[in-house]
Amino acid sequence: MATLGTPRIGPRRELKTALESYWSGKSDESALLEAAAGLRAANWARQKSLGVTVIPSNDFTFYDHVLDTSVMVGAIPDIYGWKSGPVPLATYFAMARGAQGGNDDAACAHGHQGDGHAHGAPAQEMTKWFDTNYHYMVPEFTSGQRFQLSSLKAIDEYREAKALGYQTRPVLLGPVTYLKLGKSKDANLDPLSLLPDLLPVYIDVLKRLAAEGAEWVQIDEPCLVLDLDDATRKVLRAAYEQLADALPKLKVMLTTYFGGLGDNLDAALSLPVTGLHIDLARAPDQLEAVAAKAPHDLILSLGVIDGRNIWRANLPALLDRLEPVVSERGADRVQIAPSCSLLHVPIDVSLETDLDAELKSWLAFSVQKMGELATLGEALAKGRASVADALKASADAAAARKASPKVHDAKVEGRIAAVTSDMARRKSAFAERAKLQRERFGLPPFPTTTIGSFPQTAEVRKARSAHAKGTLSDTDYEKFLQEETARTIRWQEDIGLDVLVHGEFERNDMVQYFGEQLSGFAFTRHGWVQSYGSRCVRPPVLFGDVSRPRPMTVGWWKYAQSLTAKPMKGMLTGPVTILNWSFVRDDVPRSLACRQIALAIRDEVSDLEQAGATMIQIDEAALREGLPLRRSEWKTYLDWAVECFRLCASGVADATQIHTHMCYSEFNDIIDAIASMDADVISIETSRSKMELLDAFKTYKYPNEIGPGVYDIHSPRVPAVDEMTGLLKLARERLSDRQIWINPDCGLKTRKWEEVRPALVNMVEAAKLMR
């Protein structure tokens, strides 16, 4: 029974506390190192006590394991001032957060991190780890790149575990995946061409681990589940042959996860390694092909426990699949494991004392998943009778969940069956709608607006916390929120914004706010998962059929619109984003769960329109994040994702204007899907890329209206008027004046008022100059 990695944050987010104390200067480096050592020791002890027999080391990180790899191999850009020798913690955190004033460089309202460019050295770019909600720091390579061993972390942590009595299997990110995750600063440099210079550092690390007594090493090459060309497969083969030649006695467990090997199976099986790990949660169908083709002396690690979702496994059903493989290959040739590292799930469901008892009995967090592994291992080694009670409990939980009325709602199933294609189409084409909307609103050219949220100040957070604790009454809390909203609306009018928002002070999180008001969702108290560094998220649990018992935003919209004669946007989170940022039920297709959410949001859109809303924004911040890893699967996903957006947005009159917002750095390759969403206005993040995102529109004639962001909200810097007009002139080269709206990149929730005020004043001034 092996684990590939465990959550780093601690059951009570102890890592977050220690990091933020260190960053703010309240504690020193030794206190941070001591806290980290305590978390590692607790992790190893927990795994041992739960019956895990193959325990990893070097799976802990202060910020991100890809950044740890960059530091290990000395891939540190010159801007951070490091030349050689061990990399100081200050340099490490400068790469992670930017130097001098990294605290200012917040995530946006949708949790996407800034790039620290405000002042000092910028942070490295950050992006999603494959198709998960974890983020990694993107390695940067230049021509003439040199690598050198500059961190002994992997060796130190192996030694640390050994001193505590644990024989561990150290984890390294594989050299080929590491290079593929990186970015070259030189357009002509293929990162894979750097492999001959990189491998000697890996060999040095592996030799040091072997000298310390490591018999096994886990090397992660998740790139093997991607679309690879023959050249990459060749590079993989060359890399592992070189490692095997240098260390013939070291046993390597090559791990793949987040998908099936597919057409890379032969390439993976040809590598000179001792073991191969496959993901059987994401790609259960690959078991037969791998088992049939794998050489008999290859140890197979079968990732049967889902490392990315929180549902309890049906252990007897898993044993039905595992037993034939074990009897065919022999128990010593099979390991069982989670599908991937457990960093993607919370730590311990037993901490959830407020959760519905029936729902709780269906869940397994990291601790429970290790317990499931131990049960499977025992059953395979000694027979099912040895763990009969645990197997019965598992089967009973699966049966109870399947039959529970909490999961199934006949009304929702009836509505889904009644959905027609007309429900996902606006009444008229955009050209006709646009004419009606222009007549209705009479907006000037280059209309100005914001994305939705305004700064959530310390006072707002304090009031929310007091209300949650019961020390601030419902009446007083509502009065406070009304005052904040009214003040924000007055200020928007004063500076001359054309289309207003209410500021979203009543909302804690753009997904949680809606999930808490929809049936079929539940929320944990301690279900934290690392997003990056000290930032943790608590995804909602989507456990059953979704419906909307009552209006969710109409009351606040009506109050806000009553304070102004200008258009006030209704603000909603879209179904695809709610789905992609939740732990999703695994008993129905994701597309069906999304369609249910879309119908609930459609009801809200309809109620907002009936209440008088003339503009309704439906944010799809995470539409792109749901793209499958293999391009051949993109179309299926985009078809249902776009259909779900249209289903929630298309029940309105032609004169009602539907807005959507997307924040990410790349959509040229899905421009057709974005156009087919048919939103009247789409706002996007473009300021940091200097409008490069709009290159897609040079050849693609996008018909609808678009708000390219002119103010980078990830940075505290206030952009000047001429900077914004410069960006708008670039936009004008690709779009007609009539199409362009003017707005920031994203919501303003994480910024300070003293930054937002001058920036938006400048934005309005830029609009006037463009007119």
UniProtKB/Swiss-Prot annotation:
The pathway it acts in is: Amino-acid biosynthesis; L-methionine biosynthesis via de novo pathway; L-methionine from L-homocysteine (MetE route): step 1/1
The entry marks the following residues as binding Zn(2+), namely 661, 663, 685, 746
> Which organism's genome codes for this protein?
Nitrobacter winogradskyi (strain ATCC 25391 / DSM 10237 / CIP 104748 / NCIMB 11846 / Nb-255)
What's this protein's function?
Catalyzes the transfer of a methyl group from 5-methyltetrahydrofolate to homocysteine resulting in methionine formation.
Catalytic residue positions: 714
UniProt family annotation: Belongs to the vitamin-B12 independent methionine synthase family.
Q: Which cofactors are named for this entry?
A: Zn(2+)
Taken from the UniProt record, the cysteine pairs bridged by disulfide bonds within this chain are none
The protein's name in its UniProt record: 5-methyltetrahydropteroyltriglutamate--homocysteine methyltransferase
